[in-house]
Amino acid sequence: LVDLREAIGNGLTVQPIANMVNHETNELFFDNLEIPASSLIGEEGKGFRYILDGLNAERTLIAAECIGDGRWFIEKASAYARDRVVFGRPIGQNQGVQFPIAKAHIEVEAADLMRWRACEQYDRGENAGASANMAKYLAAEASWAAANACLQTHGGFGFANEYDVERKFRETRLYQVAPISTNLI
């Protein structure tokens, strides 16, 4: 455990990374940073195992965030499909509009089941690595599918700031590559 007030300038440098999403991101540079033995958390030599276990929790939390995003996109798309009238009827009466939203809903709910499985394993102290990775993968894919369905449902209006779709679209894309890329799971 390191007190940043003491470490910054004494071997630790924090460099912000500018980005377009609502997540503060920084690079950390360690250069001969001395850490007292009293700062040790857990058993010496087991730090990597602790990190991996922490990543399981992180991936499960990211899965939950993706599921929330996916549900937001589905609700936004569904509401717009009900309200937007073209040629005298709501666009949601067209199967071509309905099916991508319904498919995204199915994918989000399936990802949520895997997320709960990972949470339960983690809470019981079991190895949740595989379930956490599957939950993160499925949820990232599901939220991205929901984002695409939502943007497609809104058409050109999906890029208008007033609908918030374009902002969330950019944010949910992040989880295809972070905290671990879906093609590395």
Which residue stretches match the model-derived regions?
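Structured core elements
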Residues: L1, T13, E27-F29, E34, ...
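FAD-binding core of flavoproteins
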Residues: L1-A79, R89, P179-I185
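Active-site lining segments that contact anionic ligands and/or coordinate catalytic metals
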Residues: T25, G45, A57, G96, ...
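Residue-level signature of the cytosolic catalytic core of signaling kinases
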Residues: E43-E44, Q93, R124, N161
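Glycine-rich phosphate/cofactor-binding loops in nucleotide/flavin-utilizing enzymes
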Residues: L52-D53, H154-I185
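Alpha-helical coiled-coil segments
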Residues: E65, G96-F99, I106, M134
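Alpha-helical transition-metal enzyme core signature, strongest for iron centers
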Residues: I67, R71-I74, I101-A111, R115, ...
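C-terminal helix-coil-helix/basic helical segment that borders enzyme active sites and/or dimer interfaces
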Residues: S78-G92, H105-L138, L151-H154
